[in-house]
């Protein structure tokens, strides 16, 4: 239950920053604060070392089964850039731990904003030196795709029905007619290859 509750704090913590209710803090800091609050709520006494260790779990996330093969297939024809609400140090660790072959990491701390703020999507296009209509955001989150589409980016929904755990009730399916809707990254590669 603690783990699920901690994961559920992700978006509300970022929203407090986005809405000006809290000063800018990167995602590791937000995860740490959420963990401290939940530890108190659950009556757990976590010392500094344990707080750091548990917060560090986010740095060692495992990729979905299709991720590596799909990314390598896509990388043969496209630039692959992570556009993440994670901070750069977090995403570097995730990439190294999982062997993710990103060409570039575009993280929230580069922009001082979290998605779905426009500064993140447009900042990514600027850093890639591409107009929005030549950039495709691939995501498992409909809110993310909606914000990207509103700014002119192409969109691809990747189904991840366990993204939020076994009780997931949101983002189970595409909620709009995105440019592409794929079951995984290998399916996305097949669809892109067929449309080329």
Task: Show where each model-derived region lies.
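Substrate-recognition element of Asp-dependent hydrolases with the DxDx(T/V) motif
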Residues: 49-97, 105-108
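Conserved donor sugar-nucleotide recognition element shared by glycan-biosynthetic enzymes
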Residues: 31, 63, 117
């Amino acid at each position: 239950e603690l783990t699920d509750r901690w994961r559920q704090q992700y978006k509300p913590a970022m929203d407090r920053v986005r809405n000006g209710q809290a000063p800018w803090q990167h995602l590791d800091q937000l995860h740490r604060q959420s963990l401290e609050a939940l530890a108190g709520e659950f009556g757990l006494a976590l010392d500094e070392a344990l707080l750091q260790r548990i917060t560090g779990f986010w740095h060692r996330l495992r990729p979905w089964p299709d991720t590596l093969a799909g990314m390598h297939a896509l990388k043969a024809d496209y630039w692959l850039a992570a556009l993440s609400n994670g901070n750069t140090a977090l995403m570097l660790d995730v990439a190294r731990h999982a062997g993710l072959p990103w060409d570039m990491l575009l993280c929230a701390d580069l922009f001082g904003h979290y998605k779905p703020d426009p500064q993140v999507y447009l900042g990514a296009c600027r850093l890639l030196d591409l107009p929005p209509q030549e950039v495709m955001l691939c995501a498992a989150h409909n809110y993310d795709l909606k914000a990207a589409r509103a700014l002119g980016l192409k969109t691809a929904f990747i189904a991840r029905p366990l993204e939020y755990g076994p009780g997931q009730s949101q983002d189970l399916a595409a909620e709009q007619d995105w440019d592409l809707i794929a079951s995984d990254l290998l399916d996305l590669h097949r669809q892109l290859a067929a449309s080329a």
